[in-house]
Structure formats: C-alpha cells, structure tokens
C-alpha cells in the first residue's frame, strides 16, 4: 500500500520484537514516519520459528492483569492508557489463564504484524543491520533483544566498551527488604569496611549454624534444577558459578566463598561466631530491595523459594525476582544511557527493550513505548517529558537508567542485572498514606501489605494519566 507522506524525516527502529514494534507504533501514532528494520526473513535466530513481528519465543503469558495490587498489572494498565499496540493485540488474542493475561501466540504475532504493515507511516524493511546506524540516521532506536546478531553486538561493544555488553545473565534472587527478619539478621559490612559511599553497615547478614548450613547445602544439591535451552549452551565460568554448582564441588566450598563468615559479628549474639553467613546487599537507591550476594542459580523457581527460605532471617522472605543464568544480551544501561534512553556517547541513538536490562515481555514493550515517544518528541523539536517515578513506567525507567546501585564486589565484572517490574522499584508512599480501614480489628501483616500495594497502584495510575496529558 502507499504510505502517507509526512513533513518529518523518518526515525529508524532496528528490531521487530515486542519493543521495536511498540516503539515504531508510538512514533507513527505521533505523526512521525518510521522505518522498522527486521532481519528475520533474511536471517533467522536460534530461538525464533517464524518471520512474524513480536513473536513470543518462550511463554505465552504476560503475567498478572491485576491493576489494583500487582505491579505488572499496573504496567499493563499504564500501557493501555498510552495506546499500546502490544497490549491491544494481547487483549484481542487473550486465552483463559485465570488472573493472568495469556495470549494465542500465533494470533497475537499476526495481529501485531498486520497492524504494523497497515499503518500508513510505518515501512518494514527485511534486512540485517550489521553495525550501528549510519550518521545520516539522525534518530534511531536499537531494540534487537536478547538474541542480537553477532555483528551488531560487536558494533555495540566497540562503541560502548568491552565490559559494557553482557551475553549471559547471572541473576541472584532479590528480596523485598521489609520481609527480612531483622530480629535474626543484622547490618554490617565485612570487617566494617566503609568503601565508596558506604557506612560500614551496607549489608544485611543472615547467620547459619553448622547444622543449618549442612541442611542448606543438602537442599541446594537436591533441589530441582532448570536446564539450558539448546541454543544457550552452558556458559559457566568461575566468576559466576551457580550456587548449587559450587555446593556440588564440596561441602565447604560455600563457607569459603559467598557464605564465608569472616569479618562479621552477629549483633544479636556477639559471643557466638556464625558457621556461615548469607549476605544481602542493597540493590536499589530506595533501599527497598536487597540481592543475595553470590546466589546466582539454575534452581527452578519453586525450589528457590523452598530452599532460600531455609536461611535464618529469610523464612518469610518475599522475592521481587528469583535467580537464573541464561543467554541475554544487554548493555550496562545506568552507565551508558541518559534518562531518555539515549546513548550518552551518541546523541540521537536510543536503546529499547530487553537489551536495556529489563526483563519480561511487557517490560520490554513498555521501554519500547517510552523510547518511541521520546524519539517522536525529539523529532518534533520538543524535549521528552519523563514519566513520574511513582508510575510503573517511571519506576522501571529509573531502575534501568540510574536506580541500580553499582558495587565493586559483585561476582564477575558487572552488578547491573535485568529486572522485572515490581513494587520494590517504586518510591515509598508518603507518611500517613495508609490508614486502618474503618471497622478493621487489625491492620498489619498481609492486610497492611495488600493495602500498601493497592495504594501504590492507585497512585501510579493517577500519576500516569496526568503524565500522558502533558507528554507529546
């Protein structure tokens, strides 16, 4: 079909997955022409099976659709408010999945592909882009996802630096800070070391007796483990071994590795030396999330909850993210990108989707949505208006572009790791925002936690609507 002309020069989007498709749609809906470059049809990947745009490689679930008390459900709702193509096509191709939003994967991808093909301001070119965009592409978005082709990945590495591009996630679980039992745990850095920006009390420490340690090691070794996808290979290297692999190398390995007790004194029982210690380190600037240091794992999710709650102090832990180790090409976004997702070293070039370090279908699409809106605003000569950090959009964007705390003692060379949306990324509620429901006999525990989530969700949707009224 003939494409409608526009007075604006086109914006180029590289990658026709969830993020790239959403970015292209948002740009076009803003009245700016866009050229979407997708290599499938010319060159396939090890995971994709079709040439459709927005093909779902793994699950067909977009997870919870509850916008009243679930962070991903809030993100769904915000995307719908913003006119998301991905959410529109998901809703049109929904299949029964309880409280979750799951889709017919073929119908979904076909719907996205058709909408993109039919839009008068979008042109799809089936070609592989082997390097960074040429200089005459003054505005471009790279949204090539976790399976970025080798030539482009190498070009990104050359532009950003040798340590700025990761090809595998070594993900340790992340715990909501308010679910850690501080009657058992205590704050202390090893040897009370202060370090850059530290206080000497930068870690939460969980003590284990020998009996508890032995039981924990046995459970780790016996735990149900996930295998690698055929196309992932087995990327173990010593700086980033799964915790259960370390345990299998010898019963004392963990005590002399990530669970070593040296330099730590139990504040609750100073005269008794712990046999082993699990350390958790602050993961976000808000201090609402803590990651389990050195606990990258291939245990299946169900096993992780059972095994890690054996650790004293984590018996009631709620996890913002569980651990994993898998193929996932992504950049060190907090260092490389500004808050509008633009590469600091190259104005006009944005990154979007999973390559920025977000995790999950809707998270990737939402960052594509933001990148598309920001690029369209820039094309129109308007400064992008950032979403408030109180929204799901803003909380995720803030984590990617600067909310993560960088640490020098992370296993391997990186500390920024991909993250799903969760309420731990949102700023705390204002004092007094939670009040006891009228007639309620108690307001603590699960009731208070639910009320907190509901208040955060309500605030997010209200602030998102206000932001959309301002944004171009």
Swiss-Prot record:
Its cofactor is FAD. One of its GO terms (biological process) is tRNA wobble uridine modification. FAD binds at residues 15-20. GO terms for cellular component: cytosol. It catalyses: uridine(54) in tRNA + (6R)-5,10-methylene-5,6,7,8-tetrahydrofolate + NADH + H(+) = 5-methyluridine(54) in tRNA + (6S)-5,6,7,8-tetrahydrofolate + NAD(+); uridine(54) in tRNA + (6R)-5,10-methylene-5,6,7,8-tetrahydrofolate + NADPH + H(+) = 5-methyluridine(54) in tRNA + (6S)-5,6,7,8-tetrahydrofolate + NADP(+). InterPro entries: FAD/NAD-bd_sf, MnmG-rel, MnmG-rel_CS, MnmG_N, TrmFO. Its main location: cytoplasm. It is found in: Cytoplasm. It comes from the Bacteria. Its EC number is 2.1.1.74. GO terms for molecular function: flavin adenine dinucleotide binding; tRNA (uracil(54)-C5)-methyltransferase activity, 5,10-methylenetetrahydrofolate-dependent. Keywords: Cytoplasm, FAD, Flavoprotein, Methyltransferase, NAD, NADP, Transferase, tRNA processing. HAMAP family: TrmFO. Catalyzes the folate-dependent formation of 5-methyl-uridine at position 54 (M-5-U54) in all tRNAs. Belongs to the MnmG family. TrmFO subfamily. This is Methylenetetrahydrofolate--tRNA-(uracil-5-)-methyltransferase TrmFO. It comes from Rhizobium meliloti (strain 1021) (Ensifer meliloti). The lineage of its organism: Bacteria, Pseudomonadati, Pseudomonadota, Alphaproteobacteria, Hyphomicrobiales.
